[in-house]
Amino acid sequence: MKELEEYAKINNIPIMQKDGILYLINYIKENNIKNILEIGSAIGYSSIMMASINSDIRITTIERDKDRYDLAVFNIKKYNLDKQINIIYGDAVDTDITGMYDLIFIDAAKGKNIFFFEKYKNNLVKGGTIITDNLSFHGLVEDSDLVKTKNQRGIVNKIKDFISFLDNNEEFATEYIPVGDKIAISKRRSGYE
């Protein structure tokens, strides 16, 4: 995995931070998660880490960037995980998924978090979880004085809108975990399943 981590760092490709991925791996183990939908593959790092936990785990992951998709396909085959990981080339905005999943992991365009959450929540099994990464945006969400560009401000505002969406969501209860770039763990409340 060091090789993928170094490649991502050198090529400025966002992958989940080390303590975040370790938390995610432990969560998957503790909750006996077997079927995962990942929105945003990048180079396949998270999928490879999750699939490596157990040979019974099956992952469907979606990536819209062709170069990253091709690299993810290469990496998944390199680690002999192509039987466990199904990678789809396409935009998760337009991709229709029919499977049901124990875990939906959203790690894609931050401005689309609400859309992805709403679109894919019906692919969640009873008792399933939606985990969303990058809710701190490198500390900019908590400290707006650090925001330097209009683009950053737009992303920060969309993340704040998403956090408000989660906080006011009657269907899902959400817990925020300060690991990596901050993650949200959202579980459907009883009575909504």
Regions found by a protein language model. Name each.
Residues 1-103, 110-131, 135-193:
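A short alpha-helical cap/connector motif
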